[in-house]
A protein has these predicted regions:
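Tubulin/FtsZ superfamily GTPase core signature
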Residues: 1-219
Length: 219
Protein backbone atom coordinates (compact mmCIF):
# COMPACT_ATOMS: atom_id res chain seq x y z
CA UNK A 1 0.00 0.00 0.00
CA UNK A 2 1.12 3.56 -0.40
CA UNK A 3 1.86 6.47 1.88
CA UNK A 4 2.04 10.22 1.43
CA UNK A 5 4.51 12.35 3.37
CA UNK A 6 5.03 16.09 3.07
CA UNK A 7 7.66 18.62 4.08
CA UNK A 8 7.12 22.38 4.16
CA UNK A 9 4.17 24.75 4.35
CA UNK A 10 3.09 24.60 0.73
CA UNK A 11 2.44 20.82 0.52
CA UNK A 12 0.65 20.92 3.87
CA UNK A 13 -1.66 23.66 2.61
CA UNK A 14 -2.33 21.76 -0.63
CA UNK A 15 -3.15 18.43 0.97
CA UNK A 16 -4.59 19.58 4.29
CA UNK A 17 -5.25 16.72 6.68
CA UNK A 18 -3.96 14.16 4.18
CA UNK A 19 -0.44 15.55 4.50
CA UNK A 20 1.82 14.14 7.22
CA UNK A 21 5.24 15.42 8.11
CA UNK A 22 7.86 12.76 7.47
CA UNK A 23 9.31 13.24 10.96
CA UNK A 24 6.22 11.53 12.41
CA UNK A 25 6.91 8.21 10.72
CA UNK A 26 6.25 5.71 13.53
CA UNK A 27 3.07 4.45 11.88
CA UNK A 28 4.99 3.94 8.63
CA UNK A 29 7.58 1.81 10.40
CA UNK A 30 4.78 -0.21 12.03
CA UNK A 31 3.06 -0.52 8.67
CA UNK A 32 6.24 -1.84 7.03
CA UNK A 33 6.53 -4.54 9.69
CA UNK A 34 3.08 -5.86 8.76
CA UNK A 35 2.69 -5.43 5.00
CA UNK A 36 -0.55 -6.29 3.27
CA UNK A 37 -0.14 -9.64 1.46
CA UNK A 38 -0.06 -9.30 -2.31
CA UNK A 39 0.76 -5.59 -2.35
CA UNK A 40 4.11 -3.99 -3.03
CA UNK A 41 4.84 -0.81 -1.09
CA UNK A 42 5.79 2.67 -2.11
CA UNK A 43 6.01 6.09 -0.48
CA UNK A 44 5.49 9.48 -2.08
CA UNK A 45 7.37 12.34 -0.42
CA UNK A 46 6.33 15.87 -1.35
CA UNK A 47 8.41 18.89 -0.40
CA UNK A 48 8.44 22.59 -1.22
CA UNK A 49 12.25 22.60 -1.05
CA UNK A 50 14.33 19.46 -1.49
CA UNK A 51 17.43 21.56 -0.87
CA UNK A 52 16.16 22.75 2.52
CA UNK A 53 14.78 19.39 3.64
CA UNK A 54 17.37 17.09 2.06
CA UNK A 55 18.76 15.81 5.37
CA UNK A 56 15.28 15.15 6.80
CA UNK A 57 14.23 13.29 3.67
CA UNK A 58 17.41 11.19 3.76
CA UNK A 59 16.90 10.39 7.44
CA UNK A 60 13.31 9.35 6.79
CA UNK A 61 14.24 7.13 3.85
CA UNK A 62 17.00 5.44 5.84
CA UNK A 63 14.51 4.68 8.61
CA UNK A 64 11.86 3.03 6.44
CA UNK A 65 13.30 1.93 3.10
CA UNK A 66 14.29 -1.69 2.74
CA UNK A 67 14.80 -3.94 -0.25
CA UNK A 68 11.14 -4.13 -1.16
CA UNK A 69 10.08 -0.48 -0.85
CA UNK A 70 9.80 1.95 -3.73
CA UNK A 71 9.60 5.69 -3.26
CA UNK A 72 9.61 8.98 -5.11
CA UNK A 73 10.40 12.54 -4.07
CA UNK A 74 8.34 15.30 -5.67
CA UNK A 75 9.64 18.85 -5.29
CA UNK A 76 7.37 21.90 -5.62
CA UNK A 77 10.39 24.18 -6.09
CA UNK A 78 12.86 23.75 -8.95
CA UNK A 79 16.56 24.19 -8.17
CA UNK A 80 19.99 23.84 -9.72
CA UNK A 81 20.45 20.63 -7.69
CA UNK A 82 17.73 18.74 -9.55
CA UNK A 83 20.18 16.48 -11.44
CA UNK A 84 22.00 15.62 -8.21
CA UNK A 85 18.69 14.66 -6.59
CA UNK A 86 17.75 12.54 -9.61
CA UNK A 87 21.03 10.65 -9.28
CA UNK A 88 20.69 10.34 -5.51
CA UNK A 89 17.09 9.23 -5.06
CA UNK A 90 15.15 6.44 -6.73
CA UNK A 91 12.80 8.91 -8.40
CA UNK A 92 12.85 12.70 -8.23
CA UNK A 93 10.77 15.17 -10.19
CA UNK A 94 9.52 18.76 -10.12
CA UNK A 95 5.80 19.48 -9.73
CA UNK A 96 3.82 22.67 -9.29
CA UNK A 97 0.64 24.53 -10.12
CA UNK A 98 -2.65 24.87 -8.30
CA UNK A 99 -4.14 22.26 -5.96
CA UNK A 100 -5.95 20.19 -8.56
CA UNK A 101 -3.06 20.25 -11.04
CA UNK A 102 -0.66 19.15 -8.30
CA UNK A 103 -2.72 16.04 -7.54
CA UNK A 104 -2.91 15.16 -11.22
CA UNK A 105 0.85 15.57 -11.59
CA UNK A 106 1.44 13.24 -8.64
CA UNK A 107 -0.70 10.54 -10.23
CA UNK A 108 1.11 11.07 -13.53
CA UNK A 109 4.48 10.62 -11.79
CA UNK A 110 3.31 7.44 -10.09
CA UNK A 111 2.29 6.07 -13.47
CA UNK A 112 5.38 7.20 -15.37
CA UNK A 113 8.05 6.30 -12.82
CA UNK A 114 6.60 3.36 -10.89
CA UNK A 115 3.73 1.69 -12.76
CA UNK A 116 4.82 2.09 -16.38
CA UNK A 117 8.43 1.17 -15.65
CA UNK A 118 7.32 -2.09 -14.06
CA UNK A 119 8.77 -1.36 -10.62
CA UNK A 120 5.49 -2.62 -9.20
CA UNK A 121 2.68 -4.46 -10.89
CA UNK A 122 -0.26 -2.15 -10.24
CA UNK A 123 -2.58 -1.41 -13.12
CA UNK A 124 -5.03 1.48 -13.12
CA UNK A 125 -7.76 -0.59 -11.50
CA UNK A 126 -5.43 -1.29 -8.59
CA UNK A 127 -4.44 2.37 -8.41
CA UNK A 128 -8.09 3.40 -8.20
CA UNK A 129 -8.58 0.92 -5.38
CA UNK A 130 -5.60 2.34 -3.49
CA UNK A 131 -6.85 5.90 -3.87
CA UNK A 132 -10.37 4.95 -2.85
CA UNK A 133 -9.07 3.36 0.35
CA UNK A 134 -7.40 6.63 1.28
CA UNK A 135 -3.91 5.17 1.42
CA UNK A 136 -2.59 7.78 -0.94
CA UNK A 137 -4.17 11.09 -1.98
CA UNK A 138 -7.68 10.48 -0.74
CA UNK A 139 -8.94 14.01 -1.08
CA UNK A 140 -8.16 17.64 -1.57
CA UNK A 141 -10.66 19.78 0.29
CA UNK A 142 -12.21 22.92 -1.11
CA UNK A 143 -14.69 24.82 1.06
CA UNK A 144 -17.35 27.08 -0.38
CA UNK A 145 -17.99 27.87 -4.02
CA UNK A 146 -16.59 25.52 -6.65
CA UNK A 147 -16.70 27.91 -9.60
CA UNK A 148 -13.33 29.57 -8.91
CA UNK A 149 -11.17 26.46 -8.87
CA UNK A 150 -13.17 24.76 -11.62
CA UNK A 151 -12.14 27.55 -13.97
CA UNK A 152 -8.48 26.64 -13.40
CA UNK A 153 -8.98 22.90 -13.95
CA UNK A 154 -7.60 21.49 -17.20
CA UNK A 155 -7.88 17.83 -18.13
CA UNK A 156 -4.47 16.30 -18.73
CA UNK A 157 -3.43 12.99 -20.22
CA UNK A 158 -4.04 10.92 -17.14
CA UNK A 159 -6.00 7.72 -17.20
CA UNK A 160 -7.10 7.96 -13.59
CA UNK A 161 -7.58 10.66 -11.00
CA UNK A 162 -9.91 11.52 -8.14
CA UNK A 163 -11.07 14.42 -6.01
CA UNK A 164 -12.59 14.78 -2.59
CA UNK A 165 -14.53 17.99 -2.04
CA UNK A 166 -15.90 19.41 1.18
CA UNK A 167 -18.82 21.82 1.06
CA UNK A 168 -20.34 23.91 3.81
CA UNK A 169 -23.99 23.14 4.45
CA UNK A 170 -24.96 26.63 5.59
CA UNK A 171 -27.09 27.06 2.48
CA UNK A 172 -28.78 23.97 1.12
CA UNK A 173 -29.56 25.54 -2.25
CA UNK A 174 -25.94 26.61 -2.60
CA UNK A 175 -24.84 22.98 -2.28
CA UNK A 176 -27.22 21.96 -5.06
CA UNK A 177 -25.93 24.75 -7.29
CA UNK A 178 -22.33 23.71 -6.65
CA UNK A 179 -23.07 20.09 -7.46
CA UNK A 180 -24.74 21.09 -10.71
CA UNK A 181 -21.76 23.22 -11.77
CA UNK A 182 -19.34 20.46 -10.78
CA UNK A 183 -21.20 17.71 -12.62
CA UNK A 184 -21.59 19.84 -15.74
CA UNK A 185 -17.88 20.63 -15.88
CA UNK A 186 -16.68 17.07 -15.21
CA UNK A 187 -18.95 15.70 -17.93
CA UNK A 188 -16.89 17.69 -20.45
CA UNK A 189 -13.66 15.90 -19.61
CA UNK A 190 -11.95 13.29 -21.74
CA UNK A 191 -13.66 10.59 -23.76
CA UNK A 192 -16.89 9.63 -22.03
CA UNK A 193 -15.71 10.18 -18.47
CA UNK A 194 -17.66 8.52 -15.71
CA UNK A 195 -18.67 10.69 -12.78
CA UNK A 196 -19.52 9.12 -9.42
CA UNK A 197 -20.66 11.27 -6.51
CA UNK A 198 -20.83 9.97 -2.95
CA UNK A 199 -22.21 12.03 -0.06
CA UNK A 200 -21.10 11.32 3.49
CA UNK A 201 -22.08 13.22 6.62
CA UNK A 202 -19.74 13.77 9.54
CA UNK A 203 -21.43 13.46 12.92
CA UNK A 204 -19.12 15.99 14.55
CA UNK A 205 -19.30 18.57 11.77
CA UNK A 206 -22.13 20.06 9.77
CA UNK A 207 -20.43 19.24 6.50
CA UNK A 208 -20.65 16.69 3.73
CA UNK A 209 -17.82 15.15 1.79
CA UNK A 210 -18.30 14.67 -1.92
CA UNK A 211 -15.96 12.19 -3.59
CA UNK A 212 -15.79 12.43 -7.36
CA UNK A 213 -14.24 9.80 -9.60
CA UNK A 214 -13.49 10.54 -13.23
CA UNK A 215 -11.41 8.57 -15.65
CA UNK A 216 -10.49 8.57 -19.29
CA UNK A 217 -10.10 5.42 -21.34
CA UNK A 218 -6.96 6.71 -23.05
CA UNK A 219 -3.65 7.75 -21.57
Amino acid sequence: MSQLRCNGKVPTIVFGEVARDIVACKEVVDWLKSPVPGFEDFIVIITDSAVEYEERIDAFLQSVVNGRLYYMVLDMNDSLDRQRFRNKWMSYNIIGGNKVETVIQILHNIYAHILKTGMISYDFTDLQYILKQGCFVQSVCFKGELSDWLESFHAQANASYSFGLTLNLDEGEGVKDNLYVLHERLCRLGNNPEVKISLQSYEDEEMETIVIWTYDDEY
